[in-house]
């Protein structure tokens, strides 16, 4: 019914993820590593926003944030997350669910140092997710931080770090004609994975 290859159930999910991201890097005009990150309060009130994936290995998927932002506070209180990658040009998506753990201070320091100077200054000047009476207030704080550090090193603030998502489930979705889509989910089984194809 279609010449689109079916998802390979024998594939390692991390290898398949890497292959799909590689395809997205060739076809998506902007931010192929963009993902929706859903968190929830302890009583189950969800929130979601777009972030950029900043690292992936056999341990999990890494992103960074202000720990005092809404997502940071929710993850500290309820350390579980759902991620969604959607590549419209490829008609594909990947969903990932699992608990999170904090990245090490060394990992956070290394990534923070790799950011542009203005991004580092902004991380210090911003009370992320807090009310802001006037944009000029933030710009004045940014200027003050800029003057404080000058051309010197800019330290990572204690309230800025990262999380690693430890995947318990990774679902791959491939569009097919007539909404007869192809879906497969890998779920953790000890140190291995169980894989199941799903009805569309």
From Swiss-Prot:
Q: How is the cofactor bound?
A: Binds 1 FMN per subunit.
Instruction: Identify which top EC class this enzyme belongs to.
Output: oxidoreductase
| Cofactor(s) the protein needs | FMN
- Pathway, per Swiss-Prot/TrEMBL? Cofactor metabolism; pyridoxal 5'-phosphate salvage; pyridoxal 5'-phosphate from pyridoxamine 5'-phosphate: step 1/1; Cofactor metabolism; pyridoxal 5'-phosphate salvage; pyridoxal 5'-phosphate from pyridoxine 5'-phosphate: step 1/1
Q: Which PROSITE patterns match?
A: PYRIDOX_OXIDASE
Which processes are annotated in GO (biological process)?
A: pyridoxine biosynthetic process
Q: Write one Pfam family the protein is assigned to.
A: PNP_phzG_C
EC number(s) per entry = 1.4.3.5
Keywords, in A-Z order: Flavoprotein, FMN, Oxidoreductase, Pyridoxine biosynthesis
NCBIfam families per UniProt? pdxH, PRK05679.1
Give the family from UniProt: Belongs to the pyridoxamine 5'-phosphate oxidase family.
Protein name listed in UniProt: Pyridoxine/pyridoxamine 5'-phosphate oxidase
Gene name of the record: pdxH
């Amino acid at each position: 019914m279609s010449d689109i290859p079916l998802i390979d159930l024998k594939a390692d999910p991390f290898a398949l993820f890497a292959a799909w991201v590689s395809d997205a890097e060739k076809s998506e005009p902007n931010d192929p590593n963009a993902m929706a990150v859903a968190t929830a309060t302890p009583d189950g009130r969800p929130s979601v926003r777009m972030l950029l994936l900043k690292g992936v290995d056999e341990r999990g998927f890494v992103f960074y944030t202000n720990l005092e932002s809404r997502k940071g506070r929710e993850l500290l209180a309820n350390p579980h997350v759902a991620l969604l990658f959607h590549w419209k040009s490829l008609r594909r998506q990947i969903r990932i669910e699992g608990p999170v753990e904090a990245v090490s201070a060394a990992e956070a320091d290394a990534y923070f140092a790799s950011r542009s100077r203005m991004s580092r200054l902004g991380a210090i000047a911003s009370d992320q997710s807090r009310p802001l009476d006037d944009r000029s207030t933030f710009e004045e704080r940014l200027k003050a931080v800029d003057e404080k550090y000058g051309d010197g090193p800019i330290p990572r603030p204690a309230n800025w770090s990262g999380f690693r998502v430890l995947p318990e489930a990774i679902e791959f979705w491939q569009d097919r004609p007539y909404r007869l889509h192809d879906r497969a989910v890998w779920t953790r089984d000890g140190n291995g994975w169980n894989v199941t194809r799903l009805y569309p």
